[in-house]
Amino acid sequence: MNSFIYNIPTKVYFGENQLGNLGKELLKFGKRVLLTYGGGSIKRIGLYDRVLTELHNAGVEVFELSGIEPNPRIESVREGVKICKEQNIDVLLAVGGGSTIDATKFMAAGACVEHDPWEFFGANAKPIERALPIVTILTLAATGSEMDTAGVISNLETGDKLGRLAQPLLPKVSFLDPTLTYSVNKYQTACGSADIMSHILEVYFNTQEDLYMLDTFMEGMLKTIVKFAPVALAEPENYEARANLMWTSSWAINGFINGGKRKAWSCHPMEHELSAIYDITHGLGLAILTPRWMEYCLDETTVDKYVQYGVNVFGIDAKMDKMEIAKESIRLTAEFLFDTLGLQRTLSEVGIKRENFHTMAQKACRYGDIKGFKTLTVKDVECIFEMCE
């Protein structure tokens, strides 16, 4: 196992009836709060009123920024930065899913610099050395942004969707109440589950063979998704299902499973190009890509990892031929994503045309070949897009 540093000091309030602690946590950082959220869902489920009550009881001054988009835009980040600077905001409170939290992270960072927040991204990205404190209330189990140092922002003007990692982006406190996800519809529950699964598979499929502890941890999380995602779809107010998905979402991407693993992610840079141009749901794009990426990477040098995955996650008979186990593991992954979760199978089903495949492949490899489970060139990425067609 390679050396690594693990430092995720986010304080988590998990479970029902935890919002009573919101006021005291915010007051640790100041009294001027920027409340950020997306559309009207937090108002429809009564969460908005609950949050405002807690904030007013704490005696803080509240400023609001609503309308943060799925695949959040740099324009929303800029507006948040403007409010932070003009109103001398002390702490940001993001209420929503990963899009709201991601946008809020870069508002918090942008408030501490003079340059445009888009300069945090790209090949010549400026450093993120500090950010205003961030507190989150999670309403969707998917991205894990509530407990990680990352965020992804879209720029429609340039046609880019880019991610960034930086320790100051880590939320100080996150409230994870599974009941707040009861109202999430089947489609978003399915997309969120696919997103969580991809976060794990991106790390799990690795050529290092000395990470038994981390591999078994990841296999447990994968089995959790396979078990509880269908339950959440059938019984949206099943607390155990929602709780297991929510906690798995956080641990899938908070840095723990990365310990000692050095390979780059493969499906995420490819998917970012799909949603940058076509604005599809991130988890859906990952679902379409993942089985084809797995199929493309399968050969005699990688087959053992598929065997481990198929036997330990899906219970495939270990006595079968190795290549047959590998192929069956891919088939079962696709069956879970497309049949069990009910997500679309192909890019053409969601309106993505071959005409942009080459351009998207080039942009996915903007920093060079993707050095993941198997190194992917522009041509490789284009081939995977074609397999998804």
Where are these regions (language model features)?
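ATP/NTP phosphate-donor binding region
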Residues: 1-91, 347
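A glycine/threonine-rich phosphate-anchoring loop and its flanking beta-alpha core
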Residues: 10, 20, 113-210, 304, ...
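Fold-independent oxyanion-binding glycine-rich loops
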Residues: 16-17, 37-39, 68, 95-97, ...
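Short Gly/Thr/Asp-enriched flexible loops that form oxyanion-binding sites at enzyme active sites
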Residues: 51, 78-81, 100-114, 147-148
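Glycine/serine-rich anion-binding loops at beta->alpha junctions
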Residues: 89-105, 139-145, 277-280
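Active-site segments that bind and position negatively charged phosphate/pyrophosphate groups
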Residues: 203, 207-332
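C-terminal charged capping/lid subdomain of soluble metabolic enzymes
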Residues: 313-389
